[in-house]
Amino acid sequence: VYSTFLQRAYDQLIHDVSMQGLKVILAVDRAGFVGEDGESHQGIFDTSYLNSVPGWTVYAPTYYAELCSMLYQAIYVDPGAVAIRYPRGGEPTPPEGYQYEKEPFRIFGDPGAKRCLVTYGRLFDTCLQAIGELDDIFVIKLNRIRPIAPEAVAAAAKVQAIWFYEEATVSGGVGQTFAALLEEKGTSARFFHKAVPDTFVKQASVDSQLRKFGLDKASIVSEVNHAEENPA
């Protein structure tokens, strides 16, 4: 089901699935920006509304192999309701030697670095490219975005500055949840959250939409460098 159409089933997600404790698996297509599909088809709200319903597990694959493995896990391993969200379009090239091993998150780069990017889904590839142009930074790739693994939060809590990037609305989404979990850890790290603010996304190419909201590689590199040059 397209992310935008799943919005119409919000009542069923709560009353007919979660409250009944049913085993339901949703493949949420067109999650994130959908480019020329149109303003009403942008899949930017599913992370927020799925975040609000008890009992759901949500995955966000970047690659086809992850999607297949997550679907298998949803069918045969995970209890309860599961959603697997993925974007319109093809897959980026996986990092050399990368294999998904059913872990809820994965760190790429030096985990002892002083800064980190946190992201999921399609934007992982963008963030991975961005750190190639930055120093002293690593990426936390969230494979499961609900519930967020406590170990992922603990890894981020050790750094001095954290940037969370997501192709979804800011309000009620994964980034806000991650920030709340960081606060519970008592971290002193600076936290920056880049996502879609309180607005609708106009029809345009996916690349244009990513640039507009600062979610392309050049914008990420620029934002991190700017924060480095202007410490709080």
Spans of features found by a protein language model:
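Short, glycine-rich nucleotide/cofactor-binding loops
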Residues: 1-4
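Thiamine diphosphate
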Residues: 6-10, 19-47, 52, 67, ...
